[in-house]
């Protein structure tokens, strides 16, 4: 290397130092000053890791004074260059710029500049960059984007609802599935899609206080969405950052109570401009035409201000008609303006539903049904379909006509677009519940303490006394102190120990009402029989609960028993277990359903055993009988439970408080009657049309199958592991489909997106991720993959490389130039551009004559024939063919332009076809179905107009290139 004072060089190892100047030389060392970063470096002259910076004719260079020069001639004098040319700003020609006055901030961002400046990257990084671009393009184009990456089983009806709603602009819908069908997951999938496509950036979730943590965990664990819980304390803290605390976070979760109690916080939440509002347990919002409740008014005000609204609620029949109307009013007050009109309109749908039921069961349509259908759909639409149904056509044709008729009716169906409701009856795949009621003898210690408590508890209300009598172990401890070991003699504990020992190979979930009971049961199992158990209660932090859940889920060396308190178990599901023990009983049928729902969920593969050990001659025995004989609540889901409970509570509570009573048999008999009546009313009121629409039928199956195909994508595994390698993460195989990924010392960036500081255990397998909550489920949508790709792009990894092609059929020294261009439309994410024109890579492979060989030579197979070159040799090779590389880059533009035009045209076609057909459908429906909002149509028209402009203006640029030189050995 020959150095001279005033020459400009850049560092190969620290490219962020900027442009350096040689300021001192002696026999063995050279000193460079990097003015941009105010650093000096002293290198050995013989092998300094620096590259000489020389610009060529045609380049534009910046001076230290801030003006730029278009280079027309390069003059050398004793190893130092002067550039002659025209100033870009004043257009003055013949200007000279000595290299010592070049701007210190010059960065080599263009791939060709980096190549000539010797900042040559590793070959495998170039390959990784190209694969990242290609994979990202595929992901953005996929119609399933936003549905593949969540940690949830592939359950057709959930995927259908999420796919249907998640793609809408500002969806306003009511999710009213029965319990155990996964409304929270549906809402999460919709949020996830809206976030990924840029349709929603600010989201507010309002839930009952007890469910805050459940939502926080579900959003984080299943969808990698990090919400912040806002309460008074958090708002006071956030006040220092902004006047409105709600503006300090994009994703906020808070309780309805919090907004109801504080007018100031409610008003701040209103002003914070959300894109999407999600309300769980919306059936608790009370409404009467004259007097809506405060809670209802809070949500109503938020729903008026927010474009997208998801309400999660119990089934409409459980709510009653008026209450159901009140929910719909929140979604669209213009459409659902009057309760009487709504009832009339609903009644009109009854015959339609009958007609559809007839169609579904393949019966012939009666004339009355035909007339009814013709009233709803125009005659020219339905006549040919009726003919097809009655002709002797093939089964397929008849099925097609039937489906088309049903689809048309669905679209016109009053609330089909705003209401989704699945029932267990309409969805297959639920386990059978085997109920084991086990009457056990009451220990004498309990009899005594309960008798004394009965004498002393004179001041208690019947309800408080009834509650107390349900938990004899607590009464005993009141007298004997907390340390007393009731579990030494309680017959339920003895039974539990025997059951656990008999079922050594099974995981067993035990639920008790109180945290203290759960903790003491764990102690009993451990001390009396050395059984591995873990506890789960409301006093534990989320991380502690996660650890307990993971310990329970572990196949080998995990806990056999998990003991939960009532509140602690909310929202946690353990489908991998099928043994449930209720150590005591809750007061409320809904809580009972919630307990069984921990295991009895869609996705449970086996039948469930429900064990109810209860003490005879206690309130537990009465409650067990009432649940079993009055409601059949153990064996079946009980949507009517609450209504029956409300009807009999006044008569039932005194009996529970007294531990028995004459009237019990009558109450059980009457409860069973009322339950039967209510259930048959529900059955009659079942809206078949709505159910068919909600579970998505064939279409739902196809979506699930399509996503299942992408699971286990080996391409993802290879790509993700290379990506982690390139960025410098440490990987360790843990078996059982698991890897541990931790930050290493020499990482490209100080912290890696989506990876906790202490590292994470990851899996690419959906089933493993479902049974192990402590693992991250890695998919193309996971922040660790998305963030890693963004890092590659922004840090300029792999933008230029040099490789050798060992091929004796070609002369030594033959060169090829592989160029990757990207087509990019500069448009806001929320415009939806990525569906039609995401960043699109175009690969060009130029031979020395300037021919494009990319169509004959595929990337992966070509790459396998190449081998890497060390940086020093690579720099020499580049210097020797610099002129040819310039020529080929210029020639490649002619090859890339027609492909860019083709990409633009294809994107326009896709966009017009997709959005115009959606627009035509909405306009046609608007004529017959008042549920189509004007705003939806306006937004679509506007979107088509904007996207047409964005796509037309899409530009291309050179993203990366690789020089390939032929060698023979």
Curated annotation (Swiss-Prot):
Cystine crosslinks: none
Top-level taxon in the UniProt lineage: Bacteria
Gene3D superfamilies according to UniProt: 2.30.30.140, 2.30.30.930, 3.30.360.80, 6.10.140.1500, 6.10.140.2230, P-loop containing nucleotide triphosphate hydrolases, Tandem AAA-ATPase domain
Family matches, as Pfam families: Helicase_C, RapA_C, SNF2-rel_dom, Tudor_1_RapA, Tudor_RapA
Start and end residues of each Helicase C-terminal domain: 492-646
Molecular functions per Gene Ontology: ATP binding; DNA binding; helicase activity; hydrolase activity, acting on acid anhydrides
Classification via SUPFAM superfamilies: P-loop containing nucleoside triphosphate hydrolases
Keywords: Activator, ATP-binding, DNA-binding, Helicase, Hydrolase, Nucleotide-binding, Transcription, Transcription regulation
GO biological process entries: regulation of DNA-templated transcription
EC numbers, comma separated: 3.6.4.-
Domain Helicase ATP-binding residues, every copy: 164-334
Residues holding ATP: 177-184
Residue ranges of the motif DEAH box: 280-283
Role according to the record: Transcription regulator that activates transcription by stimulating RNA polymerase (RNAP) recycling in case of stress conditions such as supercoiled DNA or high salt concentrations. Probably acts by releasing the RNAP, when it is trapped or immobilized on tightly supercoiled DNA. Does not activate transcription on linear DNA. Probably not involved in DNA repair.
Protein family (similarity comment): Belongs to the SNF2/RAD54 helicase family. RapA subfamily.
Quaternary structure (record): Interacts with the RNAP. Has a higher affinity for the core RNAP than for the holoenzyme. Its ATPase activity is stimulated by binding to RNAP.
Record protein name field: RNA polymerase-associated protein RapA
Chain's gene name: rapA
């Amino acid at each position: 290397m020959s150095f001279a004072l005033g020459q400009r060089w850049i560092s190969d190892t620290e490219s962020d130092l900027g442009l350096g100047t040689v300021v001192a030389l002696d026999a063995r060392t050279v000193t460079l000053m990097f003015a941009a970063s105010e650093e000096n470096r002293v290198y050995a002259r013989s092998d300094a890791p620096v590259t000489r910076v020389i610009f060529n004719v045609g380049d534009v260079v910046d001076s230290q004074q801030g003006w730029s020069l278009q280079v027309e001639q390069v003059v050398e004098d004793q190893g130092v260059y002067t550039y002659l040319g025209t100033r870009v700003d004043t257009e003055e020609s013949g200007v000279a710029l000595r290299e010592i006055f070049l701007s210190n901030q010059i960065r080599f961002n263009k791939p060709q500049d980096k190549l000539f400046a010797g900042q040559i990257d590793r070959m495998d990084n170039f390959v990784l960059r190209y694969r990242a671009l290609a994979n990202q393009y595929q992901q953005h184009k996929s119609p399933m984007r936003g549905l593949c990456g969540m940690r949830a089983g592939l359950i057709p009806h959930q995927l259908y609802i999420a796919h249907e709603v998640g793609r809408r602009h500002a969806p306003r819908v009511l999710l009213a599935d029965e319990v155990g069908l996964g409304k929270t997951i549906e809402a999460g999938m919709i949020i996830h899609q809206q976030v990924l496509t840029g349709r929603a950036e600010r989201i507010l979730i309002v839930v009952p206080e007890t469910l805050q943590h459940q939502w926080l965990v579900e959003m984080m664990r299943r969808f990698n969405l990090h919400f912040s819980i806002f309460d008074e304390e958090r708002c006071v803290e956030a006040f220092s950052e902004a006047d409105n605390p709600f503006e300090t976070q994009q994703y906020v979760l808070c309780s309805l109570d919090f907004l109801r109690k504080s007018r100031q916080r409610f008003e701040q939440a209103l002003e914070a401009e959300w894109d999407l509002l999600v309300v769980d347990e919306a059936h608790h919002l009370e409404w009467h035409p004259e007097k809506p409740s405060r809670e209802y008014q809070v949500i109503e005000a938020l729903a008026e201000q927010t474009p997208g609204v998801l309400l999660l609620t119990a089934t409409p029949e459980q709510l009653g008609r008026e209450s159901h109307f009140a929910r719909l009013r929140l979604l669209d007050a213009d459409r659902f303006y009057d309760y009487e009109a709504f009832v009339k309109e609903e009644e009109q749908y009854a015959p339609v539903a009958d007609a559809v039921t007839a169609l579904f069961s393949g019966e012939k349509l009666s004339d009355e049904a035909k007339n009814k259908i013709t009233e709803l759909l125009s005659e020219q639409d339905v006549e040919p379909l009726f003919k097809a149904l009655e002709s002797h056509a093939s089964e397929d044709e008849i099925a097609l006509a039937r489906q088309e008729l049903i689809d048309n009716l669905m679209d016109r169906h009053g609330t089909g677009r705003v209401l989704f409701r699945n029932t267990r009856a309409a969805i297959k795949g639920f386990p059978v519940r085997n109920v084991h009621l086990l009457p056990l003898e009451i220990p004498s210690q309990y009899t005594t303490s309960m008798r004394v408590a009965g004498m002393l508890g004179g001041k208690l209300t019947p309800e408080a006394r009834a509650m107390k009598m349900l938990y004899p172990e607590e009464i005993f401890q009141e007298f004997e102190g907390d340390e007393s070991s009731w579990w030494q003699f309680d017959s339920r504990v003895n039974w539990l120990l025997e059951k656990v020992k008999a079922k050594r190979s099974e995981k067993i979930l035990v639920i008790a009402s109180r945290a203290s009971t759960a903790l003491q049961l764990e102690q009993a199992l451990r001390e009396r029989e050395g059984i591995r158990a873990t506890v789960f209660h409301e006093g534990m932090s989320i991380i502690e609960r996660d650890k307990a859940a993971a310990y329970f889920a572990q196949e080998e060396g995990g806990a056999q028993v998990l003991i939960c308190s009532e509140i602690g178990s909310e929202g946690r599901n353990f489908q991998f277990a099928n043994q449930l023990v209720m150590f005591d009983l809750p007061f409320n049928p809904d809580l009972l359903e919630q307990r069984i729902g921990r295991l009895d969920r869609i996705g449970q593969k086996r039948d469930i055993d429900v064990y109810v050990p209860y003490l005879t001659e206690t309130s537990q025995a009465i409650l067990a009988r009432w649940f079993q004989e009055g409601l059949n609540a153990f064996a079946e889901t009980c949507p009517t439970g609450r209504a029956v409970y409300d009807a009999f509570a006044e008569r039932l509570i005194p009996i529970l408080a007294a531990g028995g009573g004459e009237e019990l048999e009558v109450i059980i008999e009457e409860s069973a009657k009322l339950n039967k009546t209510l259930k048959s009313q529900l059955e009659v009121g079942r809206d078949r049309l709505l159910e068919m629409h909600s579970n998505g039928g064939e279409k739902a199956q196809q979506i699930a199958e399509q996503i299942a195909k992408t699971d286990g994508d080996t391409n993802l595994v290879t790509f993700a592991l290379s990506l982690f390698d390139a960025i410098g993460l440490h990987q360790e195989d843990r078996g059982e489909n698991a890897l541990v990924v931790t930050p290493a010392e020499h990482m490209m960036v100080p912290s890696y997106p989506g990876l906790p500081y202490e590292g994470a255990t990851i899996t690419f397998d959906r089933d493993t991720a479902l049974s192990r909550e402590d693992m991250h489920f890695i998919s193309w949508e996971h922040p660790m993959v998305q963030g890693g790709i963004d890092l590659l792009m922004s840090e300029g990894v792999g933008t230029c490389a040099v490789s050798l092609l060992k091929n004796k059929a070609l002369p030594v020294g033959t060169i090829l130039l592989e160029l990757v261009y990207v087509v990019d439309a500069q448009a806001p994410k929320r415009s939806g551009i990525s569906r039609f024109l995401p960043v699109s890579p175009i690969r060009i492979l130029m031979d020395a004559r300037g021919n494009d060989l990319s169509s004959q030579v595929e990337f992966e197979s070509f790459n396998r024939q190449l081998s890497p070159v060390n940086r020093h040799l690579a720099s020499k090779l580049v210097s020797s063919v610099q002129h040819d590389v310039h020529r080929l880059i210029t020639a490649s533009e002619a090859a890339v332009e027609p492909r860019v035009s083709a990409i633009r045209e294809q994107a326009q076609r896709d966009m017009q076809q997709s959005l115009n057909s959606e627009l035509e459908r909405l306009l046609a429906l608007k004529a017959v179905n008042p549920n189509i909002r004007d705003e939806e149509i306006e937004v679509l028209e506007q979107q088509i107009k904007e996207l047409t402009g964005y796509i037309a203006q899409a530009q291309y640029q050179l993203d990366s290139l690789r020089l390939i030189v032929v060698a023979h050995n």
